[in-house]
Amino acid sequence: IALAAGDVSATDTVMLAPIPSNAAIVTIKLFNDDLDSGTTNTCDVGVYSESNGTFTALDDDAYASAITDLRAAVGGVGTDVTYEARNINTTGQRVWEDAGQTSDPGGYLFIGLLFDAAGDTAGDLSFVIEYVVN
């Protein structure tokens, strides 16, 4: 994803991918350019629903909360953020459960980033999300 400086301002969201609501997330890895002009950028990784092009946070920090990993370039094996905020006891839990829902809404939910504090630097963000559906 090519991000403009204005895409990483405080309260901005960036959707990564739609995931079947009944899938279990195995890994969320981020690879990125330095997206911070200083040392202020923080973001959450969470679950969102979508209706008519509008995204709503179900749990905006289900996987990661206030991470600082986008402050410097990350290549190689990337940064695994799957369990930064998520308890390892939830391994195998479905995305709808990660989102705090009481039942499976069906369809797709989205994995997205919410920028808590601005980085305001343009750059690229790549990701790998591995999941299983049983």
Give, region by region, the residue ranges found by the protein language model.
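Surface-exposed, low-hydrophobicity beta-strand/loop segments enriched in small/polar/acidic residues
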Residues: I1-N134
